[in-house]
Amino acid sequence: MAIGTFAQLKTAAANWLDRSDLTDRIPEFITLAEARFNRNLRIRDMETVSTAISTTAGTREYSLPTGFVQMKEFHLSTDPITPLSYITPEMMSRLWAGSAKSKPQVFTIIADNVRLGPNPDATYTTSMLYYKTFTALSDSATTNDMLTNNPDV
């Protein structure tokens, strides 16, 4: 049986369970599996690129994209490209606590935000390669990259 949709996955799970008393719980089992995949996997299907962050002079903190899990690479789209190095939040506070402005050199992640150091002195376009969560399967979102490319996991 090919498994390519949420309905087909639920049917396959029901076949494997071979128990009718758990059929109504199958969507819950799928949700729990998706949470585990998002927590433990870092595979190519989870990679995405965002150029949504454009800095503003003097503003150092920006919201991370929805579904962000982990940064893989982050740079300013300058000529030549300016790679941004990760430092811990503690190091960011020690090195770039003031209001000095210059071209950012480093970044850290605090909660759902990325913080740049030093404060940007101008507008810069960024490019972020990061791992994102898989789209959660449901009756309205019947497939995602995990199910399409890895239905056997």
Model-derived features: where do they sit?
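Glycine-enriched, solvent-exposed interface loops adjoining structured elements
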Residues: 1-153
